[in-house]
From Swiss-Prot:
Purpose: Exhibits a very high intrinsic GTPase hydrolysis rate. Involved in the addition of a carboxymethylaminomethyl (cmnm) group at the wobble position (U34) of certain tRNAs, forming tRNA-cmnm(5)s(2)U34.
Cofactor: how and how many bound: Binds 1 potassium ion per subunit.
InterPro entries: G_TrmE, GTP-bd, GTP-bd_TrmE_N, GTPase_MnmE, MnmE_dom2, MnmE_helical, P-loop_NTPase, Small_GTP-bd
Pfam family, one: TrmE_N
This protein's UniProt keywords: Cytoplasm, GTP-binding, Hydrolase, Magnesium, Metal-binding, Nucleotide-binding, Potassium, tRNA processing
Molecular-function GO term, any one: GTPase activity
Keyword GTP-binding belongs to the record: yes
Binding site for Mg(2+): S230, T251
The species this protein was found in: Buchnera aphidicola subsp. Myzus persicae
Assembly and interaction partners: Homodimer. Heterotetramer of two MnmE and two MnmG subunits.
Locations listed in the record: Cytoplasm
BP-aspect Gene Ontology terms: tRNA methylation; tRNA wobble uridine modification
Family, per entry: Belongs to the TRAFAC class TrmE-Era-EngA-EngB-Septin-like GTPase superfamily. TrmE GTPase family.
Name of the protein: tRNA modification GTPase MnmE
Length: 453
């Protein structure tokens, strides 16, 4: 795609620094090179250059890099100027370059958008650039790089390829739809439905793992009232985020706090104490607590160490029974260990393993942090990539359409209905990589990028 306008923007952060970099991309870049450098540098070589203003006044000197189309990040002619890190020099250079006809400042994310529109990267890879820049943990950096290198795109493209092959097999027989459907075709359709379902399930699984890195592992702090749940949230997050009192039922709504534990991104969720109550407001809080518990990746179940051991076991067993079908990782925590002056270690009560802590004094908290990291690292898999909410929504749309198509086929054996569903599935999946997309979606995605990307 040829853009009439050429764009320019600083690649480096604003402010004083040792080096600042300007990037220029577009059809006028050769003219920019001739006017600012005096000539076009040798392609893909670092060239020492003087950066010229009007009337050949030297504004700065440094390194120029020339990437002729299509062998550049954007797929267009690209010039990069690496000069001294003075904001004033950068401003003078930008003013000089934008004075050239059809050259303007780039919008946020416009270089990446042009790379996408010119087929250099797909939409997943474009989003991965933004995710990589905004990564706050080592695991999310690795996952963003996997996406940038095309691992995520490969999963989606394999799924699309299966859908296209399926469509090809059945659409060729639509012209003969008034005839009895061939037994071999029926058999093929069932085989393809099974194959497609298996690939959907596999893709949904890896996307679910990828969303944990993007949004953080959801760790819900649950337990009876006054067990010290809010104190634990404060201790883990090094903050006074939650209100702590001796009055049972102080926490009545969900409280979220995003933290990083040794490079593991986590979202802590403090919940209302679980008990039977007639208080309507507290009951709503408890209902919300159960809702978020059932969607958790990990539950820290906190009970008061001063409670009788038989009662501790009863409370834990009741909780396990309530969420047994959800297959959620549970860590049992005995809080207020400082009040009984016991050792801060792990202990077994019958078959359950407990970690002893004092959220008030901070004792045992480091041991709990190490435990959370150990579980997270055991769950982490190489090759996981970042999955955005947009990706998850599109996969769910495609999978739900598939389930409907499968059901309709079993009931009606209508090839035309099946073909239409496969067409929709193909479109839903294509929107993930950008094969089918709208200008509004592109604007929303790329406007969140920083200028220069």
């Amino acid at each position: 795609m040829i853009h009439i306008e050429t764009i320019v923007a600083p690649v480096t952060s604003p402010g004083k620094s040792a080096v600042s970099i300007l990037r220029i991309s577009g059809s006028q870049t050769k003219i920019v090179a001739k006017k600012v450098l005096g000539s076009i540098p040798k392609a893909r070589f670092a060239t020492y250059s003087k950066f010229l203003g009007k009337n050949s006044v030297v504004l700065d000197q440094g390194i120029s890099l020339w990437f002729p189309a299509p062998f550049s990040f954007t797929g267009e002619d690209v010039l990069e100027l690496q000069g001294h890190g003075s904001p004033l020099i950068m401003d003078l250079l930008i003013k000089r370059i934008t004075s050239i006809e059809n050259v303007r400042m780039a919008k946020p994310g416009e270089f990446s958008e042009r790379a996408f529109l010119n087929g250099k990267i797909d939409l997943i890879q474009a989003e991965a650039i933004d995710d990589l820049i905004n990564s706050e943990t080592e695991s999310s950096i690795r996952a963003s790089l996997h996406s940038l290198q095309g691992d995520f795109s490969s999963h989606i493209k394999q799924l699309i390829s299966t859908v296209i092959e399926f469509r090809t097999n059945i659409e060729s027989s639509i012209d003969f739809s008034e005839e009895e459907i061939d037994i071999d075709l029926k058999s093929l359709i069932y085989i393809k439905l099974k194959e497609l379902e298996e690939k959907f399930i596999k893709t949904k699984k890896v996307i679910s793992e990828g969303s944990l890195l993007k949004e953080g592992k959801k760790i819900v702090i649950a337990g009876p009232p006054n067990a010290g749940k809010s104190s634990l949230l404060n201790a883990l997050s090094h903050s006074n985020r939650a209100i702590v009192t001796k009055i049972p039922g102080t926490t009545r709504d969900l409280l979220y706090e995003n933290i990083s534990i040794n490079g593991i991104s986590c979202q802590l969720i403090d919940t209302a104490g679980l008990r039977d109550t007639k208080n309507e407001i507290e009951r709503i809080g408890i209902f919300r607590a159960w809702e978020v518990i059932k969607k958790a990746d990990h539950v820290l179940f906190v009970i008061d160490k001063t409670t009788k051991q038989s009662e501790q076991k009863k409370i834990c067993n009741e909780f396990i029974q309530n969420i047994s079908v959800n297959n959620i990782q549970i860590t049992f925590i005995l809080n207020k260990n400082d009040l009984v002056q016991d050792k801060f270690n792990t202990e077994k009560i019958e078959s359950l393993l407990f970690i002893n802590i004092s959220a008030r004094t901070g004792q045992g908290i480091d041991k709990l942090r190490k435990h959370i990291v150990k579980i997270a690292k055991n769950e982490n898999k190489e090759g996981v990539f970042i999955a955005r909410r947009r990706h998850i929504n599109q996969i769910n749309l495609a999978y739900n359409e598939f389930l409907m198509a499968k059901k309709k086929w079993i009931i009606s054996k209508n090839i035309e209905l099946l073909a239409e569903s496969l067409r929709l599935i193909n479109r839903f999946l294509g929107e993930i990589t950008g094969r089918f997309t709208s200008n509004d979606l592109l604007k929303r995605i790329f406007s969140s990028f920083c200028i220069g990307k």
